[in-house]
Each structure stands twice: as structure tokens, then as C-alpha cells.
Amino acid sequence: MDLKTKYYLKSKFQEYYRTAKIHLPAKLPEREWGVLSFDDMPETVMRRHKSFGSAGEVEDYLTGMAPAHVYYSVAYYTYPNAPTMKEKQWLAADLIFDLDADHIPGAPNSYSDMLDHVKKETLKLYDLLTDDFGFKEEDIGAVFSGGRGYHFHISDPRVLSLESAERREIVDYISGRGLNLDKIFVKKGVSGDAGSEKATMNVFPSEDDGGWGGRINHHMIAYLRELAAKEDAEKLFTGFDRIGKKTAKRIVEILRDETQVDLLKKGNMEALSRVNKDIIQTLAERSVTELSASVDEPVTGDIKRLIRLPGSLHGKSGMCVTSLSISQLEDFDPLNDAIVFSDKPVKLKVIRTFAVQMKGKDLHVEEGVQELPEYAAIYLMCRGAAEYGP
């Protein structure tokens, strides 16, 4: 990034911060702060061990310095501006989840498609946190990172004192890591008629049970019934390992029988297991993959982590780190709603071919002098794909 581009970006960020609505963390004086400056680029120098006593101090700093990236600690400290972590004296920490395209398997290459994919993972995480951990919507602060994903902030008193290992256990649960399906899908003894041997029955948690068992049951039966309702259902089931035409026909019959489906929902999987003993295991594994959420474990486990400040700008995109309610998250379009700069034309020198979709426009930019809307020009400059001016 050349000097002219640095000055331009810093001036635009400064202009933004003069009127920006910044969402400051609770217990502001107990937070450590860190920033990355345009002045230091291309070097990445985190200037941390800062603290602010009031909202006014934060606003003055942002307006005066216009940093490229702004972070604050998830932790609360007695002395947040002390030069070493030991001297800061850790008190507690918010519970943070980071969902980023870099850590989500199968994320598309297209920026817009990638962000849609990450949002779906984020909403899955919300379901797990509310249904299985009992958090309420108001306990969870959702934030678009300004780049490639979303953060969840939880400041519930019950989680503030959790150690790193305990936070990693939460990640293990929501990712389905280490989930032992053999302990969920069990054989249960059933008394036979007088004089007969005791029989066994394949039992799974009912769809109304809590935790992974009920979650898997509901997802698995819904998926099976969706397949069974199709005209070519039998053909679809022959696509499973070791299921021939006869077996597929019997499976479809079971899934179209409401009495049998009610038994399946209650956890009695005997009808399906008799037809094909592997199908429940296969489908349960599929459900875990579909229902689990991929989060960045080191972020959640780090009780001294710095996290982006909501309302600040992301120095690699020029977009706003945006606070959202869960209802807002569902309809949120970051490539429109997180853009804060104008449409006025800006001349720039593109140094590598670039393509991005912003504000509903597909922008394909070739090398050389170009004129783009301000928001797109800033995005390219922040990405290192262009320099300011002709």
C-alpha cells in the first residue's frame, strides 16, 4: 500500500468515525484495547495494552487516530493497560464464538455465496445455544465481523468465570466432536410372553428429548419422510449402501405409515433396523454433520482474546463491524447493509484484476486506471488490489 493510498483511507475512516455509532462493551474501564494502524502498513503491528475510562475517550481516539482495525478484550482486568498479561490481573471474560469462512468446510469461493454459507452456520449455532444451553435471544449479541463471518458475544454471568478448557468443551458439543452415537442408539430389553426369552429392541431418544439425541431424531425422520414423499422414493433409497429394491420398497412403506412414523419419532427404531441395520447409524452421522456448527475453537477457548469493536471499520474491507439482533441477522445482507461509504465516483489504479459483488452490482475490474463508486474503490484499496488516484 503506497503512501497516497494510506492517507486517503485514513482520511475516509476518520470521516466515518466523526459521526459513527459505536457499540462499546460493558465495563469499559476494565477492557484492554488494541489497534492496527494504516501508518504501520504493510507491517502488521498490534498496538495493545491500551485502556479507556469513558465513551468520550474512545470517540476522541477513533476520530483522531482513525485506525485500520479496532479491538477490545473479551476479558475484564483490574489493570487493563498493564504491559504484561500477568500484571493486568484477569477477572472474567465474555464467551465468544467466531464463525469465519476459513474454518467452515465447503465454504464457496464467491464472496457473497461464502457469506451466505457462514450465516447459515451462524444460525445453526444460535439454535444450539438457545435450545441446548438455555440462552435467550437477549443473552446473545450477534456481530458481522466486517470481513468473512460473524461473532457471537455472550455476557451471561454464568459463563464469565469459565476457564479455557470449559469453553473448549462447549465447542466440542456444538461441533458434535466426540459424540458417541453408540451411547445414543441403544438396545433395550423387552419382556416377552410367559416362558419366552427376553427380546431386545433398538431404541433412540424421542424427538422431544433434549440434547443431541432429540435433535438427531427430529432431523433424521424429517429427512427420511422428505425422501419417502417423492415419486422416485424407492430409487432414492437404493442409493444408500447395501439397500436393494426390495429393502427400499419396505422402507418407503414404513415411512408412509403414520403409525410407524409415530413410533420412530418416539425413539422406537426397530422397524427400520430390522429392514437395514446400518441405515440409522448412517443417517445419524449425516444429521450430526448437518446440525453441528463450525466455529473457530481457539477464539472461544482464549479468555484473553481481542475481538473487533462493533461499529468500527474493518481495515481489509472498509465495511462496518455491525451489531445485529437475531431477527436482523436472518435478513442481513453484508454486501449492502454493512457498506457505509458513498456511491460517488473515485479514480484509482487497479494493480490486479478483481471481481466482487457489492450493493447488488457485479463488479469485474481490470488492471489500469478505473473509476468506481467510493465504497467499491475503498474495498479494493483495503484488499490491496488498487491504489488511490490515477
Swiss-Prot record:
Cofactor(s) essential for the protein: Mg(2+); Mn(2+)
Membrane spanning stretches: none
EC number: 2.7.7.-
GO BP term, example: DNA replication, synthesis of primer
Active site: D98, D100, D296
Gene Ontology cellular component annotations, sorted alphabetically: DNA-directed RNA polymerase complex; primosome complex
InterPro entries: DNA_primase_S (IPR002755), DNA_primase_ssu_euk/arc (IPR014052), DNA_primase_ssu_PriS (IPR023639)
Keywords, in A-Z order: DNA replication, DNA-directed RNA polymerase, Magnesium, Manganese, Metal-binding, Nucleotidyltransferase, Primosome, Transcription, Transferase
Molecular function (Gene Ontology), one example: metal ion binding
Pfam families: DNA_primase_S
Subunit-level organization: Heterodimer of a small subunit (PriS) and a large subunit (PriL).
Functional summary from the UniProt entry: Catalytic subunit of DNA primase, an RNA polymerase that catalyzes the synthesis of short RNA molecules used as primers for DNA polymerase during DNA replication. The small subunit contains the primase catalytic core and has DNA synthesis activity on its own. Binding to the large subunit stabilizes and modulates the activity, increasing the rate of DNA synthesis while decreasing the length of the DNA fragments, and conferring RNA synthesis capability. The DNA polymerase activity may enable DNA primase to also catalyze primer extension after primer synthesis. May also play a role in DNA repair.
Record family assignment: Belongs to the eukaryotic-type primase small subunit family.
Protein name, per record: DNA primase small subunit PriS
Protein source organism: Methanococcoides burtonii (strain DSM 6242 / NBRC 107633 / OCM 468 / ACE-M)
Name of the gene encoding the protein in the UniProt record: priS
